[in-house]
């Protein structure tokens, strides 16, 4: 393997991959470990579709697609979707579920850096949801996403802010008290401040268009989008 390919393959945290491999068979269990992803998916999909001016007929790449929850929902909107992930088991689950659902999605096991080297400028929309905090070099992912989108195309990121409140909500609350996600899912040191993400975006051809927070209300047990990016947040960018 040459140096360039080695670098492209290096942006993988194998411990993170193993976490999701272990629970991949339950990816589509609406009451399982991925219940929060199923519950927030309509919000994510709605935000992406609205900000991108619809998805019908567009070529879309979902980076870090896992078992295919978002990828399938975008395909249902009429998009031609490719899903990328480095986890073998999640991709097998995604392929099987798409087959059973009669949904056409192409799933590929490779890094976004590898994909960008072969498919630069080929996508109308690129999504990277809850993935940046699970790789060693998130800035490299941002660069690759910028390379993959067409001029004027849209790139969406979502991740977790790094602060005390985010640690309390996403780690202590979600993992240990409410048990919404498995213990050890998140590492607060890998969370990303909005200013950091915007700084990486500024070093690419992407331009910030909109940012919103994703909020959970434990009293009503509901999620909503709105102002405030102190815990979960989503960023819409557009290629210049």
Swiss-Prot record:
Keyword S-adenosyl-L-methionine: yes
Pathway in which this enzyme or protein is active: Cofactor biosynthesis; ubiquinone biosynthesis
Superkingdom of the source species: Bacteria
Annotated GO biological process: methylation
Keywords from the named record: Methyltransferase, S-adenosyl-L-methionine, Transferase, Ubiquinone biosynthesis
Alphabetized GO MF terms: 2-polyprenyl-6-hydroxyphenol methylase activity; 3-demethylubiquinol 3-O-methyltransferase activity; polyprenyldihydroxybenzoate methyltransferase activity
InterPro entries noted in UniProt: SAM-dependent_MTases_sf, UbiG_MeTrfase
Binding site residues for S-adenosyl-L-methionine: 44, 64, 85, 129
Family per similarity comment: Belongs to the methyltransferase superfamily. UbiG/COQ3 family.
Function: O-methyltransferase that catalyzes the 2 O-methylation steps in the ubiquinone biosynthetic pathway.
NCBIfam families, per database record: UbiG
Record's protein name: Ubiquinone biosynthesis O-methyltransferase
Organism: Escherichia coli O7:K1 (strain IAI39 / ExPEC)
Lineage per the UniProt record: Bacteria, Pseudomonadati, Pseudomonadota, Gammaproteobacteria, Enterobacterales
Name of the gene: ubiG
């Amino acid at each position: 393997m040459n140096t360039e390919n080695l670098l492209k393959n290096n942006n993988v945290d194998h411990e993170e991959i193993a976490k999701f491999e272990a629970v991949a068979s339950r990816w589509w269990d609406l009451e399982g470990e991925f219940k929060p992803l199923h519950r927030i998916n309509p919000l994510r999909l709605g935000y992406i579709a609205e900000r991108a001016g619809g998805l019908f007929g567009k070529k879309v790449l979902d980076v870090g697609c896992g078992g295919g929850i978002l990828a399938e929902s975008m395909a249902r909107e009429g998009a031609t979707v490719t899903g990328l992930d480095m986890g073998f088991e999640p991709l097998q689950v995604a392929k099987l579920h798409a087959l059973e659902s009669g949904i056409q999605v192409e799933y590929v096991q490779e890094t976004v850096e590898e994909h960008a080297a072969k498919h630069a400028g080929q996508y109308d929309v690129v999504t990277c949801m809850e993935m940046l905090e699970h790789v060693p070099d998130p800035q490299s992912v941002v660069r690759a996403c910028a390379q993959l989108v067409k001029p004027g195309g849209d790139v969406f990121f979502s991740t977790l802010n790094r602060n005390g409140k985010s640690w309390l909500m996403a780690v202590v609350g979600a993992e240990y008290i409410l048990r919404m996600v498995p213990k050890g899912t998140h590492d607060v040191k890998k969370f990303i401040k909005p200013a950091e993400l915007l700084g990486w975006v500024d070093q690419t051809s992407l331009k910030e268009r909109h940012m919103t927070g994703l909020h959970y209300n434990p009293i009503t047990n509901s999620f909503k989008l709105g102002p405030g990016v102190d815990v979960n947040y989503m960023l819409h960018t557009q290629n210049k």
